[in-house]
Amino acid sequence: MRTISNQKYEITDMAHEEYPFLHRIRALRDICGEIRAGDIGGFVEGESNLSAEPGDCAWIFDDAIAAGDAYVDRDACLRGDAIACGSAYVSKGSVMSGHSRAEDNAYLRGASMTGKALASGNAQIIHDPHTMGTPILSGNCKVYGTVQGDIHITGSAVILPCEEVRNDTRDTFVLSGKSRSVIRGIGRETLQPLQKEVSPMKTKTPKKRGVER
């Protein structure tokens, strides 16, 4: 079943064993090289869970689930047994895999979640647009606050609702349980010569009497 405007995928009658209100999707055409027409995907509750835009590579693979008011778009994907539910928004190339879960009003933008990582409450897991740093959640970590930039939250680390962990540097910050460490960026220890801008030569014209050059 699909709407007339959805030429990307259809919702099949293959129901989830535990949650029969969820059904698998099937690709109606080739999608971004990895998905072929006829390929079976993961589970959705309705078309409101996955973008149907023709040029959008967003997809739900394997046994992953998008349910409730959760929405996956802009080249993001769910793999493995990942779950996006509640009003979670997974976007901008984000990848959820393993048994990771995004729920409530969690927002993922250019982020990666794996293992049993949890993004809950009003969590925001977003990449840094300047450094292009990507936040990674793994292990059994739980994030309720904001994580931005090249930060790896892992182990049993917990980011509380009032906490903001931002990284606008070229290094990688690692938070694992109660420990914190830094992985220096490539080439950060090497000194480089100053790159001076060479200003173009200006041609001077003869100054006429009473006229500024």
Regions found by a protein language model. Give the residues of each.
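Terminal amphipathic alpha-helical/low-complexity segments used for targeting or macromolecular assembly
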Residues: 1-57, 63, 81, 87, ...
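Residues at the loop-to-beta-strand transition
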Residues: 48, 58, 64, 70, ...
